[in-house]
């Protein structure tokens, strides 16, 4: 979140987000290089507070680059890079992402729901879900 800690003068805009991105990349890179886990199948999913569809719609450019380069370098692939504003007429981009190790592949298209007008929605974000299978 861009303004985390800004109003309290505890951080600059995007400062905490950039630190969180760097921490995630470091943790996952360490995990992938650990001999105990080097062959593990890993799914990382959550709110990354950045669009990865090429639009630069939301997020910090430096953090976005470090996230993509770091996780790709650690052997992860992102399954939520689709520009759903173009392909599915959504009103906002995906900021919640699903990353997996290369040995996990989607078995069907990405599921996305974007109904911001639904009275019982749980988030202001688009929902994303994906069915995966281990690569044979």
What are these model-predicted stretches?
Residues 1-136:
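Active-site regions of metal-assisted phosphoester/phosphodiester hydrolases
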């Amino acid at each position: 979140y861009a303004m985390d800690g800004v109003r309290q003068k505890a951080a600059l805009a995007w400062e905490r987000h950039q630190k969180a991105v760097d921490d995630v990349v470091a943790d996952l890179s360490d995990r992938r290089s650990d001999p105990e886990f080097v062959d593990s199948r890993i799914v990382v999913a959550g709110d990354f507070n950045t669009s990865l569809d090429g639009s630069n719609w939301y997020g910090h450019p430096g953090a976005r680059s470090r996230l993509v380069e770091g996780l790709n370098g650690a052997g992860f692939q992102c399954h939520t890079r689709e520009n759903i504003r173009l392909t599915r007429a959504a009103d906002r981009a995906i900021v919640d992402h699903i990353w997996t190790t290369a040995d996990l592949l989607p078995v069907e298209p990405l599921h996305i729901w974007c109904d911001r007008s639904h009275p019982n929605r749980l988030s202001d974000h688009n929902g994303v879900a994906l069915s995966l299978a281990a690569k044979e």
